[in-house]
A protein has these predicted regions:
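Hydrophobic membrane-insertion alpha-helices, especially the h-region
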Residues: 12-19
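Extended, subdomain-level signal for the structured scaffold at the beginning of enzyme domains
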Residues: 8, 20-159, 167-171, 188-191, ...
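Bacterial N-terminal signal peptides that target proteins for export
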Residues: 1-11
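Amphipathic alpha-helical segments enriched in hydrophobic/aromatic residues interleaved with Lys/Arg
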Residues: 202-213
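Residues that mark the start of a beta-strand
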Residues: 50-52, 179, 210
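A conserved active-site-flanking secondary-structure segment within enzyme catalytic domains
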Residues: 176-202
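Active-site-proximal catalytic alpha-helix in oxidoreductases
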Residues: 212-225
Length: 266
């Protein structure tokens, strides 16, 4: 087991023990009001070319946080008329509307969770301008990273985080005054660390239109499917989910922002 993974589970265990001692679940210490805004307004694809989806990574980046949304955006296909790919008039009529790539401080291999090595496609100096930015849970912070994210998030369509990737958005001020979510085991700690953000747990994602946050790990797939829906409609997103054999439905549930009441531990 890697040291990063050990630290993760130590934190999880400490959170669980504290919740037992005080007699309530950890989630109970996070404000549990439903998000005030949940964006479903359509996004406009570019007139030409693919939609650039940049995955911002550094050491410790969680593999699932990357792989889930990456597969969603990579497997989304449609016809030249914007219809689901199964309605295409042959292979020549099938388009892949999203272009996925990784970006980091340099092209030096990034050591992701559990030791997986990822060679970034681009550095901050030469990365294409993205329409979508995906921020997985990760350890690294740098001035160059902050400058790139603030510059590109100002002009992109949507910046999304997965799991504790929300801490980067919060640290750089992109969540101030907003409702956000993260992995439920870390929501209470992040609420304390970033009081300008209203953290909620027990939901898959929160979308404010320009910035969106997903819960832990697999929640990133739901948010990615939701973004596909915003660009190309629910039919294209549903066919993408079918291609992935993903059975989750919360990405299209109109009550995806509902927070269930927290029950005290017994």
């Amino acid at each position: 087991m890697t040291s990063a993974k050990k630290l993760f589970w130590v934190a999880v265990a400490a959170t669980a023990v504290l919740g037992y001692i005080v007699g309530v679940s950890p989630a109970a210490r996070v404000q549990a009001a439903a998000p005030s805004t949940m964006q479903t307004m359509p996004l406009k694809p570019p007139a030409t070319g693919p939609i650039n989806v940049a995955f911002l990574i550094s050491d410790g980046a969680d593999v699932m946080d990357i792989a889930g949304p990456w597969e969603v955006f990579s497997d989304a296909m449609l016809t030249s008329k914007g219809k689901p790919w199964h309605e295409a008039d042959g292979m020549d009529d099938m388009l892949m509307p999203f272009r996925t790539y990784t970006v980091s401080d340099s092209l030096k291999p990034v050591k992701a969770s559990d030791g997986l090595m990822i060679v970034p496609n681009y550095s901050f100096e030469n990365a294409p301008r993205p329409q979508v930015i995906v921020i997985p849970a990760q350890n690294g912070r740098s001035d160059a990273q902050k400058a790139w994210l603030l510059s590109n998030s100002a002009t992109d369509d949507v910046t999304m985080s997965v799991c504790t990737g929300a801490s980067m958005l919060a640290q750089y001020g992109l969540l101030n005054g907003l409702t956000a979510t993260t992995h439920h085991m870390f929501a209470a700690g992040m609420q304390k660390q970033y009081p300008a953000v209203h953290f909620v747990s027990g939901i898959r994602f929160v979308d404010h239109g320009k910035v969106a946050t997903a819960g832990g790990l697999t929640s990133g797939m739901d948010l990615a499917l939701h973004i596909v829906d915003r660009y190309y409609g629910q039919d294209v997103a549903q066919v993408t989910a079918n291609t992935l054999e993903y059975r989750g439905e919360l990405w299209k549930n109109p009550k995806f922002g509902e927070v269930k009441p927290v029950v005290a531990a017994r």
